[in-house]
Swiss-Prot record:
Gene coding for it: OR13G1
Glycosylation sites: N2
Family stated for the protein in its record: Belongs to the G-protein coupled receptor 1 family.
GO MF annotation list: G protein-coupled receptor activity; odorant binding; olfactory receptor activity
Residue numbers on the Cytoplasmic membrane side: 44-51, 118-136, 215-234, 290-307
Transmembrane segments: 23-43, 52-72, 97-117, 137-157, 195-214, 235-255, 269-289
Protein name: Olfactory receptor 13G1
Disulfide bridge partners, by residue number: C94-C186
Keyword Disulfide bond: yes
């Protein structure tokens, strides 16, 4: 049951300095367009090319969809607010944004772990890859990703909706996220904080450890490669993947592992930008555009568009 007496929230945005609004607007617009178009290109390439049918490309397609939902649920509203100075969001709109963002956050973390496992099987058991990562396994893994993400998002959104917001209603952030909403609550938030800790430990820290374990086995397998060029290419791919994963998990763990009383929103807004915009922009470049088959698929898309 919703006990809220607040019908809308005021979003302060990234900065209160008017002279920086133009620069921030342009930066976020460009990065959002790069993220959106990059991920959309992956989706089109996967759908258009029948050769991209292995589980890895299904996971990349799913990651692209998740990244588009993550950025689109936040950035357009933020840019619109900066253009019109209409910095309010309805209670329902705020809860919807929170649900979509929390869903994408959970889905992305579990997807990173799933993709790391897929690469582990492909590199460490190449002869058995098609047997292990068959259609049923792929469907099961994707179902697990969606189930965990939806459950995580539903629980956190429901716990936020049970809180009483009686004023003030000003969110010192650029979107509706759990920490700033907890800071506005007039009712106890202990249960919310406990569930955030549980989710952070199981999803963020747990998935990060599992992902690192998979890449650890991959690195051991790479060390057995005899050619220097083969090792170099494999290490280059692994290091870029681990960089993106670390860049994503670190700010998420940092943001959600602390009690609400310790939040410093000026700093946390910059940290949030890493996992809401920077990582979704880097994902296509690191995971897809370096792949030869995906490059060939993208070239086919551009060739089709020319005709």
């Amino acid at each position: 049951m919703n006990h809220s007496v607040v019908t809308e929230f005021i979003i302060l945005g990234l900065t209160k300095k008017p002279e920086l609004q133009g620069i921030i607007f342009l930066f976020f617009l460009i990065v959002y367009l790069v993220a959106f178009l990059g991920n959309m290109l992956i989706i089109i390439a996967k759908i258009y090319n029948n050769t991209l049918h292995t589980p890895m490309y299904v996971f990349l397609l799913t990651l692209a969809v998740v990244d588009i939902i993550c950025t689109t649920s936040i950035i357009p509203k933020m840019l619109g607010t900066m253009l019109t100075s209409e910095n309010t969001i309805s209670y329902a709109g705020c809860m919807s944004q929170l649900f979509l963002f929390t869903w994408s956050l959970g889905a992305e973390m579990v997807l990173f772990t799933t993709m790391a496992y897929d690469r582990y099987v492909a590199i460490c058991f190449p002869l058995h890859y098609s047997t292990i990562m068959n259609h049923h396994m792929c469907v099961a893994l994707l179902s697990m990703v969606m189930a965990i993400a939806v459950t995580n998002s539903w629980v956190h959104t429901a716990l936020i909706m049970r809180l009483t917001f009686c004023g003030p209603n000003t969110i010192d952030h650029f979107f509706c996220e759990i920490p700033p909403l907890l800071a506005l609550s007039c009712s106890p938030v202990r249960i919310n904080e406990v569930m955030v800790y549980v989710a952070d430990i199981t999803l963020a820290i747990g998935d990060f450890i599992l992902t690192c374990i998979s890449y650890g086995f991959i690195i051991v397998a790479i060390l057995r490669i005899r050619t220097v060029e083969g090792k170099r290419k494999a290490f280059s791919t692994c290091s870029s993947h681990l960089t993106v994963v670390t860049l994503y998990y670190s700010p998420v763990i940092y943001t959600y592992i602390r009690p609400a009383s310790s939040y410093t929103f000026e700093r946390d807004k910059v940290v949030a930008a890493l996992y809401t915009l920077v990582t979704p922009t880097l994902n296509p470049m690191v995971y897809s555009f370096q792949n030869r088959e995906m490059q060939a698929g993208i070239r086919k898309v551009f060739a089709f568009l020319k005709h």
